[in-house]
Amino acid sequence: MKGMLELLPVGSGVALVSAVTWFMLDRDIGLGKWALAGLLVAHGWVHMMYVFPAPEASAAAAGGLAYPFDLGRSWLVTNAGLDAGIVRMIGIGLMLLTFAGFMLAALGTVGVLVPAGWWAGLVLGATATSTALLVLTVSPALLLGFGINAALWVLVLASIWSPVAAPLAR
């Protein structure tokens, strides 16, 4: 439980930024598109943590959450007995697809270099690969990532907002 409480400030910050972004998108305030693009970029960048080694001073040793971005600790390695190298290769591939998808979706959000019509497909594809990557390394610390992916799926599938048809549907 203590570990989950450590996520509260980050989760609260993400919720606040998301609410402000939603407000701006709902009222067709131009900055809303840029805020959403920023959220997509940030979410994509977090996935790059899978290429960095776990910090020396592990939070798990102090009673906190274990470093969640370690592909070598994947349940496929520890429980299913798959080779860590294969799992790492799959994970890095998913990470690169996720990162590229979110970067392209962010560009499509603001209509720079990527057609706005591609936005929904890019967001759905990036969230699908993100979710697959998060499932590889299931951890309570990654619940926020699952939540962000779910919110993005709802945003696209419920046709709540799109750079092609802004503002939010009422």
Regions found by a protein language model. Give the residues of each.
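Membrane-interface extramembranous regions
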Residues: 2-170
